[in-house]
UniProtKB/Swiss-Prot annotation:
This is Small ribosomal subunit protein uS5. InterPro entries: Ribosomal_Su5_D2-typ_SF, Ribosomal_uS5, Ribosomal_uS5_bac-type, Ribosomal_uS5_C, Ribosomal_uS5_N, Ribosomal_uS5_N_CS, Ribsml_uS5_D2-typ_fold_subgr. Part of the 30S ribosomal subunit. Contacts proteins S4 and S8. It comes from the Bacteria. Gene3D superfamilies: 3.30.160.20, 3.30.230.10. The gene is rpsE. Belongs to the universal ribosomal protein uS5 family.
């Protein structure tokens, strides 16, 4: 699948910090701490991405994570306020079930998945985490699922049928 790069400078991106993890390296003189930040960015209009950053200070780790997230933007196909069809996103041991929901349902998702879906602009969706609940695996599984979504027009074109034939 060929992904064309999305230019972040043309979008009004909002950032959300998902987690900050403190890691320690034990040396002769004591512990040396470093920080790893996980950030999700999106324009609430069908574009979302995530990034990680590591540094000796929290603000620097967050800045690096935001930069990384802007490089990894994907486009999310939407039908109204929800997604076109049900899909399971998989990454490592993390599986995320994403189901379209009727208008007014809201975002039913936990933690990191909620951040991704809200910043992508999906207003009505059901999701369930199956397997690993590690934030990075959940986010990657969600983005993998969202990137594989296809609109009815795309599926019809691939099958060589009309949208009416496809939808019955």
């Amino acid at each position: 699948m060929i992904m064309r790069r999305i230019d972040p400078s043309k979008l009004e991106l909002e950032e959300r910090l998902v987690t900050v993890n403190r890691v320690a390296k034990v040396v002769k003189g004591g512990r040396r701490f470093r920080f790893a930040a996980l950030v999700v960015v999106g324009d609430k209009n069908g574009h979302v991405g995530f990034g990680t950053g590591k540094a000796q200070e929290v603000p620097e780790a967050i800045r690096k994570a935001v930069e990384d997230a802007k490089k990894n933007l994907i486009e999310v196909p939407m039908v109204g306020t929800t997604i076109p069809h049900e899909i399971i996103g998989r990454f490592g041991a993390g599986n995320i079930l994403l189901k379209p929901a009727s208008e007014g349902t809201g975002v039913i998702a936990g933690g990191p998945v909620r951040a991704v879906l809200e910043l992508a602009g999906v207003a009505d969706i059901l999701s369930k985490s199956l397997g690993s609940n590690t934030p990075i695996n959940m986010i990657r599984a969600t983005l993998q699922g969202l990137s594989e979504l296809k609109r009815a027009e795309e599926v019809a074109k691939l099958r060589g049928k009309s949208v009416e034939e496809l939808l019955g």
